[in-house]
Amino acid sequence: TENPDKFTENNLKKYRVVVFMSTTGNVLNSQQQNAFERYIQAGGAYFGVHAATDTEYDWAWYTKLAGGQFASHPGRPNVQKGKFTAVDRSHISTAHMPETFDRTDEFYDFKNFNKDVKVLITLDEKSYKDGKMGDYHPMAWYHEFDGGRAFYTNWGHTHETFDEPLVLQHIWGGLQWAASGPALNYNKPLRTGTLPEDNRFTKTILDKNLDEPTELALTDGGKIFYGERKGKLKMYDPKKGKVKVVADLN
């Protein structure tokens, strides 16, 4: 699905693994993020493909879950042939691989890398142009995180990738591992609490058509002071329900 509204606690309970299939940018709101955190903490699993690390940069929990963030990739061309090493062939997702092999894809450099992950495959930067991570360049990994499981593979930029038996078996093995954890258990204590639904809040507009508001302060008596960039200082009086300009610093 491309519908983030599916990220509710009741719906996520139906799935053993949630796949982020080359997502990019911000895809979930705070309610949906909350539901997904609780899903993982209840024993759910995450599977990230390629651009899944180019997703939700401001959500620190997700970065740790995914294992890192996209930093860059080669250009001109962005898709190249590279030499890989399966550094751990005891895992179900890599057991079928030779120790070293070549394949073609778009190779990410990563930042904010989670050093607690267990790396499965690395990339030799001497085998292609414009790599920026140096001698140690992870490309696929897994770990147990915050009560659940997470697996990530950087492969998957090109359509041809999904015609390669080696890649398909790698993905299938990763999915099998991710799905093999304990059953979901929402009855145990979860670190992330539930958020009330948006329709349970009442929103009141106190002022509008502001001219570049910059600062806001709330007094113990409930009055709200806020400034505008051009110098006006305004005050909202909750007893009168009105706004007035109390100073002009222009």
Predicted regions and their residues:
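Short alpha-beta junction capping motif
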Residues: 11-56, 147
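Aromatic-Pro/Gly-enriched surface loop or interdomain linker
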Residues: 1-15, 183, 189-192
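Extracellular ligand-binding/catalytic regions of CAZymes and related secreted enzymes
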Residues: 127-137, 144-194
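Beta-propeller domains with acidic blade repeats across secreted/periplasmic ectodomains
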Residues: 190-250
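Glycine-rich, charge-decorated loop segments at or immediately adjacent to ligand/cofactor-binding or catalytic sites
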Residues: 54-65
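Solvent-exposed loop/turn segments at secondary-structure junctions
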Residues: 4-6, 19, 23-27, 46, ...
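Alpha-helical scaffolding within the catalytic cores
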Residues: 2-8, 34, 134-140
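Catalytic beta-strand/loop cores that center a nucleophilic Ser/Cys/Thr
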Residues: 68, 73-147
